Structures are given as C-alpha cells and as structure tokens.
Amino acid sequence: MLLLWLYQALPTSLTRILLTAGLCVPCALVIHGIYNLYFHPLRNVPGPKLGALTDLYAFYWNWIRGVGYSKQFDRWHKHYNSSVIRIGPNDVHTTQVELYDVIHKAGSTWLKDKSFYKHFGGLDAMIDPREYRTYRTHLAPLYSQRAVDGLVSKMDDDLAICGQKTTKMAENGKAVNMARVLTTLSTSMILYNLFSMDISLWECNDYHPFLEAFEHIMAQIWLFLSYPRLATCLSLIPGTSLARLAPSWTTFMNSCAAWCDEDARKQRASDDQSIRDSHSKRYYALKHTDANDKKSIIPAPLDELFSFIAGGTDTTAYTTGCAFFYILSSPSVCRKLVKELDENASFIRNGLDYHKIQTLPYLNAVIKETLRISVPVPGCLPRVVPEGGITVGSFHLPAGTALSITQQAISLNQDIFPSPLCFSPERWIGPAAAGLDKWNVAFGRGSRQCIGTTLAYLELRCVVAYFFSRFDMTLTAKNGDGHRWVDRFVAVNLDTVEVLVLSDRWSGARY
C-alpha cells in the first residue's frame, strides 16, 4: 500500500529513485551480512555472530550499554574455548600473548588499522610509518628524560597547590575528590608542554570549566570516535544528556583556540630564546623554515590538542587515582610504602629530588602493579596482518585482518601474573620479578610506544610519594567495595576516588 501511494503521489522520476533506494539498500545490507557470516575469510573463527555481522555490535557495548566491548572478550574466549575470537567483520582478538612481541617489535610491518583510527587525531592516529617518525621526531625532545627532569619544578609547584587545597578541605571536614584533583594536575602538566605560556587551572575554587567540559566530551567519546556526524546531530536535541555535548565542545575548543592565539601572539612579540620550549613553539618555528615535508605532516597546535590532552590527562589521572584506591585498600601495602617514604622524606618534603625518588624500590613496585591491574587503555588497538597472513592457533588470518591483543589479555593473564586480580607490588621485587618487566605494557612497546611515558612516570611517582609521605588518609564510602571501571577508549572509574584526610604528618595537624 505504501509503495502504491508513493507511486501515485510523487513524480515518476522521484518515485523510481525512492523505490530503487528502498529496495537496493536493504538488499545490499542483507547480501553484505550473508557474506560476513558465511563467505568471509574469517567465517570459521569462533565468536559472537552479531560481532561477525556488523561493527555496530561493538558500538552497542561501548556506547549504548556503556560498559565497554573489551570487557566481554574474556568470557567469549572461555565460552568458545578458543584463544582466537572474531569480534568484528574483519576484527580478531587473541590471548596468545607471545604475538605481542611479533606485532610491536622494532621495524614491524604490522600497521595500525586505518578503519579504527580514522576519526582519531594527533600522533597516535598516524598510520604511515614515515609520517609518524617525522612527527614523533619533531616532538620527542619535549618528552625526553632530560626534558622531563626539567619539569620537576613545575611538578613541585603544582603539588604544593594540591597540598594547600587538600589541607583546606581537611580543615573544613570535607572529603577530597582525588579524581578531580589528579585530573587538574595531569592536565596542568600536559598544557605546560603544549604551550609556552603558563595556563593556570587551579584558580577555580571547585573544578575548572575547561575540565568539566572535557569530562562531558569524554563521557561520549565512543560516539565521537565511531559516528562523529551522528554525535553532532544528537547534541542538538534539547532536554537530553547529549544536549550538553555542543556547549561542552564549544567551551573546550574556544579555550584551546584562545590559548593558541595568545601563545602565538606572545611568541611573535618575544625573542625566541626567551620562550619556553613547547608544541606551540616548535610548530611556529617550523613555519619559518623551508622544511616543506615536515609542514605537510605536522598539524597546527589546535588540531592536535584534544588527542594530547586526552592521552596525557585521563590515563595518568585514572592510574594515579587507582593507586590511591589500591594502596588505601591494602593496609600492609600502605604501611610498607609509608615506611619507605618516611625513610627518604628529605628529598620529598624539602623539594622533590626526582633522581632519588625514581630509585625507591617499593614505590616503583606499587606504580608498576597499579599500571598492571588498572589497565589504563583496556580496549583494542588493532594492527593489520601484513602480506602473507599469519596462523594463530588453528586459524589462518589473511593479510588485511585487524588483530588485537588487549592490555587486559596480558596484564590479567594468570599464567604471567598469578592471582591477577590481587594487588601485590611484591611480585615486582626480587627473584619473583624476573622477566615481568617484559609484560609491563601499559604504555605499549616498540616504535609506537606512548611518547609521554617518561612524563607519566614522573607524575605517578611524585604524586604518590608526595601524598603518602605527607598525609594519613582513608577512603570514603563513595569508593565502593571494589575497583569498578568502564572502557571509554581509556579506562574510567565508575566510583569517585574520594579520601578523608586524617592528619598532615608534615605539620602535625590532625583533622
């Protein structure tokens, strides 16, 4: 009846177009679905049929259910009794962790999956190895050990502000939302590298509007990464949670644009030698050279800000928050850590001496164990099988297949880490630690390892050392009974990491 009405009501040419589209699109989808299920080269790889049928199944778990597709893999491996499962039409996940070295070794021909990273930005989204090397080499001096050593005074200043805000909250009998404190701290550090001018996020009594906007955006990150145009349309619907996306994105981008403009203005007005090194300085210096090859590859600061802020803020702040949760949930761990910090208080309390802090064995063990158990980037980071294909288990994966080995598959593997859900820094100390560093993969490995690894370790070590050297703390009821998180490309805590400060051991004050 509907087709008949359309035929009578609409002009002949328009009717034919609509009828053709109405018939061809569903037919094409059905044919494509049949191919994926019964004729695709991966048809014999076990896994959920809906995953084999369409990528929408991953989107369902990531955004609609909001728990994370990657959190389902372990039960599917067990259900299908297979170390290899098909998780998408052209995507496979494996728990054969020995392949991690094959994929990430120096000179690897396993490229990043273009279809997965197409809506990402910044350094991590670059597929071409030559372009990636050019961009990374351009930025690498900002993240070298020498450069990070130069950030210790900035870290010291920010921690002093954290300490002041923490004692003020304690004096007023209020709990401290460590998630927000740590997010502010991590963002402050990455902005210091992004811009040559100083940007203060500590001026607000509560939470900086820029960070609040960023938090709203990250809550919908799977929608942005999967279907950015749909995200734009849905954000225009009033009265929904998504309606906050548009103003949040506007706040975020307006702040970034204003900082870029102000930084550029100051650089034009100042002598080059007086300007602190940063992403921004390096980009504007590049504009006045003949390095056309670099110019065509390296994006403007505004285009890379979101990816660097997301990568440099959420992962580090989340991991540090997890450290607080696990340390305060483990009295014996807390006692051992505090004892070590007390014995070395002179280079924590009287200004941070990072060269000495980074040598503390139990602190390092706590950091490594936190990185392992918290799994800061829990989901797929797929690589494309190179020419010739590869056999994994009893399945041949042809060239072009997207293969993933998630951090969870390694960090929570009980053959590598016995009792993987138990927080045990001792596993990283002494004879028991032999060979474990190989599986410390929180920042990746090889040429595509996270460029901010050294900076992240600075933050993790210094924050934990400072707070647990200075304050006696306890978790509040808001933390729940266990560590609960969701996969929003980076892991996000479901429960607020909130602490009550019992005393300031440096001043002797009790609250």
Curated annotation (Swiss-Prot):
Cellular-component GO terms for this entry: membrane
Membrane-spanning parts: 17-37
Glycosylation sites recorded in the entry for this protein: N81, N344
Cofactor list: heme
Biological process per Gene Ontology, one example term: biosynthetic process
Record Pfam families: p450
Membrane topology term: Single-pass membrane protein
PROSITE patterns, per the entry: CYTOCHROME_P450
Binding site for heme: C450
Alphabetized GO MF terms: heme binding; iron ion binding; monooxygenase activity; oxidoreductase activity, acting on paired donors, with incorporation or reduction of molecular oxygen
Keywords: Glycoprotein, Heme, Iron, Membrane, Metal-binding, Transmembrane, Transmembrane helix
Principal location class: membrane
Subcellular location: Membrane
Note: Even when expressed, does not show any monooxygenase activity.
Protein family membership: Belongs to the cytochrome P450 family.
Function: Inactive cytochrome P450 monooxygenase; part of the gene cluster that mediates the biosynthesis of fungal ergot alkaloid. DmaW catalyzes the first step of ergot alkaloid biosynthesis by condensing dimethylallyl diphosphate (DMAP) and tryptophan to form 4-dimethylallyl-L-tryptophan. The second step is catalyzed by the methyltransferase easF that methylates 4-dimethylallyl-L-tryptophan in the presence of S-adenosyl-L-methionine, resulting in the formation of 4-dimethylallyl-L-abrine.
Protein name (Swiss-Prot/TrEMBL): Inactive cytochrome P450 monooxygenase cloA
Record organism: Claviceps fusiformis (Ergot fungus)
Gene designation per UniProt: cloA
